[in-house]
């Protein structure tokens, strides 16, 4: 009897031990840490301060490179981190950490470093405090060091013997390929989260890819002194002109409009039996990518309106839209897309059958939008956050006899 008890106890002990080991193994598998694999999952590694400099903050670069710094301050790059829309987005529970890697690209700018993903889940990053975090540099978003500092060197395109810091000439690094690392972020992260910035692919598929690059249009050249007291040399503008929609009310960013507008010229008089037709043609004449491009929430509106000139009553109105339409939940999918390809033209028309003799005014307006007003309200972006600008207006008055 005693022997049977001993055997039973041994079996129970063995079963418990095996169960415990298996349980620990399963628990370990359930919390495995997977390494980061894609380049957009990680920040640019920490960059030390090059010899001769006090920091790699843009504000300190601007002490010498004053004109370039003032241009950069007007750019969207300078607002990449502080932009109210972006700040609203990253506060969402559905927003993964990796979005910040294009808005504050250097490890120096990130308060926490991500070393892996728990169970491969982007919503469970393994973080550790960054001992070299620079809070002031974080506020600068995409600054000078993003493109011009690597491994203790200032990266440039020309040899200079006057710089107080080491310079490494690397035109390939400072090519459009650097732009595309962020301006072609295109991935299905989760079923309801799609990153779809395809400007780089649009440029490659367009008519200018073999002869012009991002830099051709967005960093035009001029001869100037790189810093006060130095001789003039070939330089690039650093305000990176784009949509022209300001990030704050009162600001005036440098715009680069890719569209040409060709409105009809109407005769001054018509008979009361005539139907009056007005058209305006929009052509993507200047962009090497589609318009709009970048954020899929951007769009153009074309509003054509006939008014009674005597009392401003609206007699006819048509609204057209150029842009993508997406459904974001429960699965993100593109519903439609009528963005203008490079060199593509599209004509929009409105007709009026005059109700009586009199004077009538045709009003045409084209506006460029960052997002809908509904989206802005959802993100609490009202008041000081402009959501659109007007890029064309025109009026013509006709008399009907």
Per-segment meaning from a language model:
Residues 4-16:
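Bacterial N-terminal signal peptides that target proteins for export
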Residues 26-28:
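C-terminal motif of bacterial Sec signal peptides marking the signal peptidase cleavage site
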Residues 32-52, 71-94, 108-111, 115-333, ...:
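Primarily the internal scaffold of c-type cytochrome electron-transfer domains
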Residues 58, 66-71:
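A long-range scaffold signal marking pre-active-site subdomains of enzyme folds
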Residues 275, 345, 357-361:
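Extracellular Ig-like/FN3 beta-sandwich strand-entry sites
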Residues 304, 359-367:
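Short, aromatic- and glycine-rich surface loops/edge beta-strands on solvent-exposed regions
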Residues 341-350:
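Short Pro-Gly-centered flexible turn/kink motifs
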């Amino acid at each position: 009897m005693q022997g049977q008890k001993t055997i039973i106890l041994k079996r129970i002990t063995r079963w418990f031990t095996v169960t415990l080991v298996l349980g620990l193994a399963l628990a370990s598998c359930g919390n495995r840490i997977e390494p980061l694999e894609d380049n957009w999952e990680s920040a640019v590694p920490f960059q030390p301060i090059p010899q001769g400099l006090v920091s790699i903050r843009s504000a300190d670069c601007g002490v010498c490179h004053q004109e370039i710094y003032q241009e950069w301050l007007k750019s969207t790059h300078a607002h990449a981190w502080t932009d109210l829309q972006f700040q609203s987005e990253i506060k969402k529970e559905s927003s993964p950490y990796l979005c910040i890697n294009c808005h504050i690209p250097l490890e120096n700018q990130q308060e926490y470093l991500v070393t892996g993903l728990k169970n491969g889940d982007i919503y469970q990053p393994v973080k550790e405090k960054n001992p070299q975090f620079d809070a002031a540099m974080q506020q600068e978003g995409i600054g000078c060091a993003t493109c011009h500092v690597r491994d203790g060197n200032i990266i440039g395109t020309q040899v200079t013997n006057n710089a107080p810091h080491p310079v490494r000439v690397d035109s390939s690094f400072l090519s459009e390929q650097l732009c595309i690392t962020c301006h072609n972020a295109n991935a299905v992260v989760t079923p309801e989260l799609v990153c779809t910035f395809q400007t780089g692919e649009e440029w490659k598929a367009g008519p200018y890819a073999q002869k012009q690059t991002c830099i051709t249009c967005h960093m035009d050249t001029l001869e100037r002194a790189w810093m006060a007291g130095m001789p003039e040399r070939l330089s690039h503008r650093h305000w990176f002109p784009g949509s022209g929609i300001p990030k704050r009310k009162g600001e005036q960013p440098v715009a680069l409009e890719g569209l040409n507008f060709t409105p009809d010229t109407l005769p001054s008089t018509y008979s009361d039996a005539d139907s009056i037709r007005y058209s305006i043609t929009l052509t993507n004449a200047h962009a090497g990518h589609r318009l709009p491009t970048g954020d899929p929430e951007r769009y153009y509106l074309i509003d054509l309106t006939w008014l009674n000139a005597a009392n401003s009553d609206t007699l006819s109105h048509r609204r057209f839209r150029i842009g993508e339409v997406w459904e974001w939940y429960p699965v993100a999918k593109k519903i439609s897309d009528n963005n203008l390809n490079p060199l593509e033209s599209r004509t929009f028309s409105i007709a009026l059958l005059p109700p009586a003799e009199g004077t009538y005014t045709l009003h045409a307006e084209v506006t460029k939008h960052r997002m809908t007003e509904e989206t802005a309200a959802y993100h609490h972006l009202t008041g000081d956050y402009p959501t659109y600008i007007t890029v064309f207006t025109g009026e013509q008055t006709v008399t009907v006899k």
